[in-house]
Amino acid sequence: MNQHQVMALAAMCQVAKQVQKVAQYGNNNEHDLEILLSSIIQTSPASPEDVYQGTDNLRDGYKTLLAQLSAGAQKDVEIVKYVGGLMQLERALSANDKSLNELGKRIDDIHRRLDHFAITDESVVAGLADIYSTVLSPLGHRIQVYGKPELLKQQLTQNKIRALLLAGIRSAVLWRQMGGKRRHFFFAKRKIIAIAKAKI
């Protein structure tokens, strides 16, 4: 277990936390939204940290990760389900070359639109959400989102959630690229906790 694997885990936890906020309260941290959505277009970063413009931007994610792993801490079942769902969906994606190629093309299209719009612009968020719906959702492994029905019916809420889940897939890809394995949760918990504590 290394720092980059824990960083990717923290990013997935931060995505899960933002999905919760949007689904349950209809709001989100705009800075976190920008950082997480920007990670999607970081397809050739100079370093893993560059995906998130530095690990300082993931402090909430590290805190959330610690809360899930620390002894005696109250676990958030939704966070666990979201992160597990992202990992499962990423595995399905990595096994499908056609979907991977389509994902790359669609992300390139979004990158070009950023010459005119911010990553958090509603039209860009809608574009990212559409990528999730048309490229990732057909792979199965649907991620169930929990929230207020009146919020989940709103198009903007749906778009933000799907765009955030796409960002979560980006972090799940990084987790795998850095050598992350599911067994690390059982055999490297102390190491994960130590690294996360050093980041907050």
Swiss-Prot record:
- Major location, coarse class? cytoplasm
State the superkingdom: Bacteria
Q: How is the protein disposed in the membrane?
A: Peripheral membrane protein
Give the keywords, sorted.
Cell inner membrane, Cell membrane, Cytoplasm, Membrane
* Keyword field contains Membrane: yes
Entries under SUPFAM superfamilies matching the protein: YcfC-like
Query: Which InterPro entries is this protein grouped with?
Result: HflD, HflD-like_sf
Please state where this protein is localized. Answer: Cytoplasm; Cell inner membrane
User: Carries keyword Membrane?
Assistant: yes
Q: Name one GO cellular component term.
A: plasma membrane
Instruction: Note the NCBIfam families from the entry.
Output: PRK00218.1-2 (NF001246)
HAMAP family annotated for this entry? Answer: HflD_protein
- Protein family according to the UniProt entry: Belongs to the HflD family.
Record's protein name? High frequency lysogenization protein HflD homolog
Q: Which organism is it from?
A: Pseudoalteromonas translucida (strain TAC 125)
